[in-house]
Amino acid sequence: MLEYYLSKIVKKAHMRAIRNSEIDKTAGVCAGTQIIDSSVGRYTDIGYDCVIVNTIMGNYCSLGADIRIGGAAHPVHHVSTSTVFLKEKDHIKKKFAMHSFQQFERTIIGHDVWIGDGAFIKSGVKIGTGAVVGMGAVVTKDIAPYEIWAGNPAHKIKDRFDK
């Protein structure tokens, strides 16, 4: 029982990191979550240990824990996928070439979207208003409003409401 309470204290002490982002004052962001170059709408609730990069998120969204949204892509059409051949700034000091490549595509999440624990959302994906993404889903395609998706890779399960 003591271990349970100690784990809760450690979890709460884990800090969150918000960089270059706008979080509405009514939104909730749990410990361990990183939000980078993003905006989060009103009354949106984000669970523990999420990573959200280059994302616009609407109002009234609910996100579980351990979710990954956005992130860098790599140039699979180039000779190498390494970032040492790209001109974008990153943590690598010496670059070998200066090819242009957009590493971070903007991800759009509509209003009232529910994303379950452990989901992965690829950068550049658009998730429509009222959509539901199941836990552990790997979303690589756009999701229309009010659709329910799950699986790896994620696929449409059904519409949220009858038409």
Please give the residue ranges for each predicted region:
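Conserved G/P- and acidic residue-centered "switch" motifs that form tight phosphate/ATP-binding loops
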Residues: 133, 151
